[in-house]
Amino acid sequence: MARSSIEQLTSFLRSVNGRAKKALSQNFLVDGNILRKILTTAEVQPGDWVLEIGPGFGALSEVLLSQGANVIALEKDPMFEESLSQLPMDIEITDACKYPLTSLEDKGWKGKGRIVANLPYHITTPLLTKFFLECPYRWKTVTVMIQDEVARRITAKPGDKDYGSLTVFLSFFADVQYAFKVSPNCFYPKPSVHSAVVHMRVHEQFALADSEIEEFFTLTRAAFGQRRKLLANSLKNLYPKDKVFQVLEQLGFSEKTRPETIFLEEYLKIFHLLKDI
């Protein structure tokens, strides 16, 4: 019986006298159709290296392995260690937020691979940030199940109410697409919110040198630090306001331009011009 079976899952939990832990955002996917849709969306091919975060009982791990992927899984809850060790993959009981992704090579990881995961919702943003700041050149694609509200935020367009710093951050590294929505009925126990799968196709090259990336995101974080403010006011602690006004005018923007109306490409132009003034 597949690990996506709710009967199999509940039988396991009874056998270890365990339960889903809310503190770890444990809502287990128990819908085989959704698992197959994730696999298709993720573009996993036989022989691909795949990093999975929070496998839990291993329902997603099982379909990744059936596709011929080499899976490395990071799971925080030791309750699942013995069960996951029965699958032909590398399992590490660890906190994914603290795990050094550079050590994947020690486990045989070769070249560019993929991330495919049902991310714990309480650490979604720290993990997405970690994937790209720690080793952005390691991934071909990143396909994650996250809270629907967050999925809409990271796929928002300039001018949308959800458009923000995380949107700009992820679009710098990848083409980010909202794939599909997932009902709470597809999980055990049922979460109180809807979920969604987001697929990111990572760029072959990035628009800035590695040495400039941190400074650029300091600018974009400051820009969105207080959403209702004008861009020039948001950046006043980083750059003199008159310089910001000068750059905005040079690019054809009004002094009243707000951060949530600006595209990534325009932020890059603003960054370069402010550096050169």
Curated annotation (Swiss-Prot):
The protein's Enzyme Commission number: 2.1.1.182
Domain of life from the UniProt record: Bacteria
Enzyme class, broadest EC rank: transferase
A Pfam family of this chain: RrnaAD
Role this protein plays: Specifically dimethylates two adjacent adenosines (A1518 and A1519) in the loop of a conserved hairpin near the 3'-end of 16S rRNA in the 30S particle. May play a critical role in biogenesis of 30S subunits.
UniProt record similarity statement: Belongs to the class I-like SAM-binding methyltransferase superfamily. rRNA adenine N(6)-methyltransferase family. RsmA subfamily.
Species name: Chlamydia trachomatis serovar D (strain ATCC VR-885 / DSM 19411 / UW-3/Cx)
Key words, A-Z: Cytoplasm, Methyltransferase, RNA-binding, rRNA processing, S-adenosyl-L-methionine, Transferase
Binding residues for S-adenosyl-L-methionine: 27, 29, 54, 75, 95, 118
GO molecular function: 16S rRNA (adenine(1518)-N(6)/adenine(1519)-N(6))-dimethyltransferase activity; RNA binding; rRNA (adenine-N6,N6-)-dimethyltransferase activity
UniProt-annotated location(s): Cytoplasm
UniProt-recorded name of the protein: Ribosomal RNA small subunit methyltransferase A
PROSITE patterns: RRNA_A_DIMETH (PS01131), SAM_RNA_A_N6_MT (PS51689)
Annotated Gene Ontology cellular component terms: cytosol
GO process annotations (BP): rRNA methylation
The reaction(s) this protein catalyses: adenosine(1518)/adenosine(1519) in 16S rRNA + 4 S-adenosyl-L-methionine = N(6)-dimethyladenosine(1518)/N(6)-dimethyladenosine(1519) in 16S rRNA + 4 S-adenosyl-L-homocysteine + 4 H(+)
InterPro entries, alphabetized: KsgA/Erm, rRNA_Ade_diMease-like_C, rRNA_Ade_Mease_Trfase_CS, rRNA_Ade_methylase_Trfase_N, rRNA_adenine_dimethylase, SAM-dependent_MTases_sf
